[in-house]
């Protein structure tokens, strides 16, 4: 059996370093690994099962939980050309100003203003877990404070400014 060219360390470093384009094609283009192609990345991802805890274990040494800011926002990974993808569904995209087939990620990042490090995430699939994006935000914030985070500020998009979210932020201030 051929050794996998992609690895968790390579993929995590790619996600941290690349602030704009998160695709297997982009990783294969910028990778220091010789002959890493989009198909290799796709095979590796499909054979792997990662959790938010795996992400945290990879990045916690890069984060100073006593400083910086926590930033929460969601992003839609456009999958308009994907025929079969159980995570993708029609969702509103602010970038496209309309419905797009895609995967919605709710992300929690730590930033020191100079760098942005993802520390937690949730895949938004209300039909699978009956959770809203606000529920995911609250779960991630509670987990972050449980990990010892004490940010200067928690920065959120106005979509996350519900009374219950703001009370939770204030509770940890």
Model-derived features: positions:
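A short acidic (Asp/Glu
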Residues: 81-83, 162-168
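Active-site-proximal, Lys/Arg-enriched surface segment
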Residues: 47-115, 125
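Acidic, metal-coordinating catalytic cores used for nucleic-acid/nucleotide bond scission
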Residues: 155-162
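Gly/serine-rich nucleotide phosphate-binding loop at the start of the catalytic core
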Residues: 1-50
